[in-house]
């Protein structure tokens, strides 16, 4: 009997949400996604011990423990993780712009271009990389500029249709609407339990997918942030799904029929709308879940980036 993972691969591009080299080698995803949390975890393993020491040596040669050098080393380390993944997967690796730049369009542009330049120095062209940006108004504006420069973007921390509409208008390459974090918010807020069909995160991604397909929007929809395999199965047929190694293993071990749920041919009317900055900010403000989870996600990624920079600073001072 074919595993559910193999059945999923037949209708959806499977992406691994990890920096675990062993898991990526074993599970053979098409793409990989990373974020500051994943990078921090990967750098704590023996696999990247040499890369860490090499980056510290480079930093000391650049003058040592200044904020600028510390930040540059953290960037190099994130790219070391991404470059290692790019050697394994045939597709793209997503590398995230610093979370503390989420409300600064120009700084996000500068960092994104620097990331692409560093990958190129390692022989990895921009068509192998996706620049991850938070789906703030400023992040979306940065993505709009980068797309025109031929740098494809992955808009993350996306919790609402308003964010998805703004990303579509910016013609971004790919969005990552979150599932599990939406479920977390509703379970905490209502005290209720949800099935895969009533899961608010699943419902959100289905609505966004439908809106894109019925209106001919080319931006790729990649569901992200899963709490259980049921959420993944409920989105079978989505353009892409980025999944943790643990859930990929669970799907690989599971058998039984996996029916296609999402398809461009199975859509319902949902009129195309446009959002300017005022309308975007108001729509986000009116959505308590999206507002809270976006802010929380940015804070969490910024905290992990700060932890990495702290580790670097300590090593530089040693």
Curated annotation (Swiss-Prot):
Its EC number is 2.2.1.2. InterPro entries: Aldolase_TIM, TAL/FSA, Transaldolase_1, Transaldolase_AS. GO terms for biological process: carbohydrate metabolic process; pentose-phosphate shunt. SUPFAM superfamilies: Aldolase (SSF51569). GO terms for cellular component: cytosol. Pathway: Carbohydrate degradation; pentose phosphate pathway; D-glyceraldehyde 3-phosphate and beta-D-fructose 6-phosphate from D-ribose 5-phosphate and D-xylulose 5-phosphate (non-oxidative stage): step 2/3. Transaldolase is important for the balance of metabolites in the pentose-phosphate pathway. NCBIfam families: talAB (TIGR00874). This is Transaldolase. The lineage of its organism: Bacteria, Pseudomonadati, Pseudomonadota, Alphaproteobacteria, Hyphomicrobiales.
